[in-house]
Amino acid sequence: MMVFTSIYSVVDGFFVSNFTGKTQFAAVNLIMPFLLLLGVVGFMFGTGGNAIIAKTQGEGKTERANQIFTMLVTLTAIVGFILFVAGELTMPWIVKTLGATEEMYDYAVLYGRIICISVMPFTLQILFQSFLPTAGKPHVGLTITVIAGVTNIILDFLFVGIFKWGIVGAAAATVTGECIGGLAPVFYFLSKNSSTLKFCKFKFDFKVIGKACVNGSSELMTNVSTSIVNMMYNGQLMKFYGEDGVAAYGTIMYFNFVFVAAFIGYSIGSAPIVGYNYGSENHKELQNIFKKSIGIIFVFSVAITLASVLLAGAVAKIYVGYDEGLFNLTVKAFRLFSTSYLIIGFNIYGSAFFTALNNGLISAVISFLRTLLFQIVCVYALPLIFGNGAIWLSITVAELLTLAVTLSMIFTQNGKYHLSLIHISEPTR
């Protein structure tokens, strides 16, 4: 589901770049991190609340699980609406703060304000991507997400390719897709269905909400930090390469969304199983899930890295083939950036795994170091030490540093959760 959700931005980028030019393309890429920032509450309540719901189900408390589920959906909708209003009011100031040039400013404000219309459905869509597998209906979530993504693609073709509406058309297509993705699950749960989660009467339980926030703090930190770091990348790239740097980085990010979404999607999808087995104290199965997941992520990591290196030229041609200088910069940057895919999946899974175990603190530490501290240091330090081109390796170095922390957490917590890949035999008596 995460992969299909990321297609929204990928398709928008293709049509905006090829049908409107690199100035509007750069404008969209400049404001995109802020727009993604508005939806992070869905990740926090989704992953953090999902861990509580799955554990509650594992304990056999079905009605309580339904109450928590309904409460978190309602709360997410309320917060999503507040973020929509805040986004609309602050958009011009945000665009100026991000350093938009005079040519980019109006385009960025216009695109941002249209996208803000679907902030509430977008947060709900992210939330339900966590809850539908727990409800025993992952196929429903996938079906809805595919329909939303296909709708977005068709409308992009019509609005941007045929009607020539430019970024207005691209934004309208995305808003429509996100509304389908976020509101369709609401109607599904309101109708008669066979899922293990149901809407029901509830009272706000601030203790549970607080626990969900703590559990989901790592995912919140991951997404907040990613947006902040992307803004910093854009600032550095504007200084080093100008408009071309932001456009090249944007091209990489569109495909990065898809690749990272594969890791996030797997981590979120496996979380209910982890939470359930943790709640039922099935430690043997918990270790089995962990080991198999590491193997799956390893295969994904190698495949994605090879694909990125080999297809960098084709990707750049699709997006920015109309500008030779921008094309060459994008190919070089993408190949350097793609080395991070060998590592990133393990860190994402490690953080999500601890969230599913209701250990929000360790999960948050991993996410904070990976997505904020290490990347900020690298994005500023590496260009100073090795030259401007080293900025494209900042994420790889940051992921390597995080991997060391993730592995140390796994081995130090082995006695509590039985996580180690190395079998530790019980001492004979």
Feature map (PLM): residue ranges:
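Transmembrane helical elements of multi-pass membrane transporters/channels
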Residues: 1-12, 114, 148, 177-181, ...
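N-terminal transmembrane alpha-helices
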Residues: 1-19, 33-48, 52, 77-84, ...
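Transmembrane alpha-helix boundary and packing residues in multipass membrane permease domains
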Residues: 2, 14, 51, 92-93, ...
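Residue-level hotspots within pore-lining transmembrane alpha-helices
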Residues: 4, 8, 38-42, 82, ...
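Helix-terminus/linker motif at the lipid-water interface of multi-pass membrane proteins
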Residues: 7-25, 95-102, 158-165, 224-254, ...
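Small-residue-rich hydrophobic transmembrane alpha-helices
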Residues: 25-85, 122-141, 248-312, 344-366
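Short runs within selected transmembrane alpha-helices of multi-pass transporters and secretion channels
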Residues: 46, 115-133, 144-152, 170-183, ...
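Short alpha-helical transmembrane segments in multi-pass integral membrane proteins
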Residues: 53-118, 162-217, 274-340, 381-425, ...
